[in-house]
A protein has these predicted regions:
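Active-site hotspot residues in diverse enzymes, especially metal/ion-binding acidic/histidine motifs
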Residues: 1-352
Length: 352
């Protein structure tokens, strides 16, 4: 019991971004840094009143400290995480771990064993654009997507047994991917960018490329470029883009690009890069377009917005299935939903 508490206590502290001294200060010195250190080292188990005190300071429910669901994050390959302050990186990892511990515990309660199958497992080594373009087509075929627009990328990934974690963290973070417990694929993304859903969609599929593809002997920069190209190809297949723009073009209009963005949920800049990759426009015009983008200050805020839906209700559906079927109590449901019982009852009172 002490070991479980110690592990969860440290996770809650890191998730909050606190050092041991920060936590001691947050509880007005009611416990010293040394006393907190003993809890974290599993030397002592605090009493009930102390657990309540710590849970309030760390913004978790008291039973958070005693969840035993195993969540081991695999290697995290992320282009920005390694450059972040250690405190920020720890917050991201622990928030990811915390959400997954609740999700996986809920699946365990319901007896769900949904194994992930990588549709590109036998695709082979990837080193070129032509290969990622082909891989994107293979993925669409395996997942029965046709060549149409993807309505909801988050829901698509969850339906394919990839856990998607919504985080609210610093703006500089886009997303990450890893495997949990060795075989459960996970993609986390920054929901603070929710006002730019096209960027979230692109990030999710960029991270999906890292999950699904095996890359050859190429530089990290080349690998990132191929992941970007894969994301673009999944969102906007070559056949679809050529149907929209034609086989070859000398120029593109902002209106055309805006209409494609609104329909397919991909940024105008990514559409232009995709058009270049597909041979619709040449390199000279691509550079000319991006010069215009910079001149008009459209790099961050494009003149046309994409209004879509990027969410999944799978966790909520499982939660209420377990509750209605009597497999969990109301208080357990509140805990799994990371809420107090009072807040849970208030929010979902019309559901019963």
């Amino acid at each position: 019991m002490k070991e479980i508490f110690a592990e969860r206590f440290k996770s809650a502290r890191l998730m909050k971004g606190f050092s041991l001294q920060d936590l001691a200060n947050a509880i007005d010195g009611k416990l010293s840094r040394q006393a907190l250190h003993r809890y974290e080292k599993a030397e002592v188990l605090p009493d009930g009143d102390t657990i309540v005190l710590l849970s309030k300071a760390l913004d978790v429910n008291p039973d958070f400290f005693f969840r035993s669901t195993k969540v081991e994050l695999g290697e995290i390959e992320h282009r920005k995480l390694s450059k972040m302050p250690q405190k920020t990186a720890s917050i991201i990892k622990e928030k990811t771990r915390e959400y997954l511990s609740r999700y996986l515990e809920l699946e365990e309660i319901l007896g769900l064993v949904d194994r992930f199958i990588n549709p590109l497992e036998k695709f082979g080594i990837v080193t070129s654009y032509e290969q990622v373009n082909e891989a994107a087509n293979e993925l669409r075929k395996a997942w029965n997507m046709g060549n149409n627009a993807i309505f909801n990328v988050v829901e698509l990934l969850e339906d394919k047994n990839i856990k998607v974690v919504e985080l609210y963290v610093e703006e500089d973070f886009d997303g990450l991917q890893t495997y949990v417990n060795g075989n459960i694929p996970v993609i986390a993304y920054n929901a603070r960018k929710a006002n730019k859903l096209d960027r979230i969609r692109f990030t999710l599929l960029h991270e999906l490329a890292h999950l699904l593809l095996i890359f050859g002997d190429i530089t990290p920069k080349q690998k990132e470029t191929l992941c970007y190209q894969f994301a673009g190809a999944v969102l906007l297949p070559e056949k679809t883009l050529k149907a929209e723009l034609g086989e070859h073009r000398n120029k593109l209009s902002i209106k055309e690009l805006g209409n494609i963005k609104k329909q397919y949920g991909i940024s105008m800049q990514a559409i232009v890069m995709r058009a270049r990759d597909c041979g619709i426009i040449n390199e000279h015009y691509t550079k000319k377009f991006f010069f215009l983008i910079n001149q008009m200050n459209w790099k961050v805020n494009e003149p046309t917005d994409y209004y879509g839906v990027e969410t999944s209700n799978r966790f909520e559906q499982l939660l209420f299935r377990a509750l209605i079927e009597g497999q969990i109590s109301m208080s357990k449901a509140a805990s799994l939903n990371n809420q107090t019982l009072a807040d849970f009852r208030k929010e979902y009172q019309l559901a019963f």
